[in-house]
Amino acid sequence: MPPLDDESLLRRSFTVARRAQARGNHPFGAILVDASGAVLLEVENGYLPDHDMTGHAERLLATAASKKFDPTFLAGCTLYSSAEPCCMCAGAIYWAGIGRLVYGLSERRLKTITGNHPENPTLDLPCRTVFAAGQRPVEVVGPMLENEAAAIHAGVWQGETKS
C-alpha cells in the first residue's frame, strides 16, 4: 500500500476547520482516515451552540470513532488535526486506540495566537508527553504546514468572545 499523502489529508482538516469558523465556531477540524487514506470521519469543533468547553474536534472524533470502529481497526488509522490535540483530546485519541496522529499548528504556537482567551485556555502539556505516558504507541507527526494552520486563526481570538 502506498504511503498516505499527509500534506493533502492535513489540508483537508484545515478545510474542516475553516468550515467550523464559517459556521461561527472555533476554527478547529479533524478527520480520520483508514490505512488506505479513505476518509472515515470529519468533525468540526463543537464549542457552539452549547458553549461546550470539551467540544474539541479531536475529542468528538475520537468518541465517534470508538463507537463506530473496533480498536484493532483504529490502530491502523490516522487522525489529521488542524492543531495539536490538547491533553484531553490526546487522552481520547489514546483511549479510542487511534494509532497515528498528524497535526498542523503546535500547541505552543496556538497559545501565542490565542493568548489568554477565555474560550481557549491552554495547558502546556504536549500530546507527545501524554502519549509517552501510555502503554501503547501512538505515532505523532507534526507540526506540519504550521504557517498554513496558523493562518486559519488570523483575527479569530482578538476582541470579544463568541456568544
Residue map of PLM features:
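Short beta->alpha transition motifs characteristic of CBS
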Residues: 40-47
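Zinc-dependent deaminase
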Residues: 1-20, 94-163
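Short beta-strand scaffold segments in enzyme catalytic cores
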Residues: 28-37
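Immediate flanking context of iron-sulfur cluster ligation sites
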Residues: 71-83
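Residues that line or immediately flank small-molecule/substrate-binding pockets and catalytic motifs
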Residues: 47, 81, 105
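A short, polar/charged loop-to-alpha-helix boundary motif
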Residues: 49-59, 64
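Small-residue (primarily alanine) positions within well-ordered alpha-helices
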Residues: 13, 17-20, 30, 41, ...
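Local cysteine-cluster metal-coordination motifs and their immediate loop/turn environment
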Residues: 81-100
